[in-house]
A protein has these predicted regions:
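Detector for Asparagine
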Residues: 39, 44, 56, 87-90, ...
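RNA substrate-binding interface of SAM-dependent RNA methyltransferases
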Residues: 1-70
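Active-site/ligand-binding-proximal alpha/beta "capping" segment
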Residues: 61-112
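Short flexible/disordered coil segments
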Residues: 55-57, 77-85, 123-130
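Structured adenosyl-cofactor binding patch, chiefly the S-adenosyl-L-methionine
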Residues: 8-9, 19, 27-35, 94-130
């Protein structure tokens, strides 16, 4: 779902780390061909990833559930951007969030305090493209 949404919104690429098998038949089917039109990098080495992003002057944001994080709807996304999204069970690891340039949150109403990863990714990618 994330890959398909990225393709639909014209996101430049996706970086995966420690995720499911990208080339499993189920994943390929669910992307409806987007897997073949989207730039995808698999990088499990955090040091290497942050070094690469820094060298390319990419601003990094950590999607977190934290009242002190910046409201994503009020963020200015200028230049190259990378948003880190954690998994649904544990969220983004603390060490990754702390290395990012800023922490962002999707504002939610009522008693809802989190979304599944695909839904959060879709909202965040939409905000990037505004």
């Amino acid at each position: 779902m994330i890959i398909r949404t990225a393709d639909a919104l014209g996101i430049d690429g996706i970086i995966l780390s420690g995720s499911c098998d990208l080339y499993s038949p189920k994943v390929i089917r669910s992307t409806m061909g987007s897997i073949f039109r989207t730039n995808i990098l698999i990088e499990n080495d955090t040091e290497k990833l942050f070094s690469m992003l820094s060298e390319n002057k990419v601003t990094t944001s950590a999607a977190v559930i934290d009242k002190d994080a910046f409201d994503v709807t009020k963020c200015a996304f200028e230049g190259l951007q990378a948003i880190f999204i954690g998994n649904e069970g544990n969220g983004l690891p603390k060490d990754i969030a702390e290395r990012c340039d800023r922490r962002i949150i999707i504002p939610m109403h009522g008693s809802i305090n989190s979304l599944n990863a695909a839904m959060a990714a879709g909202i965040l990618m939409w905000e990037l493209k505004k």
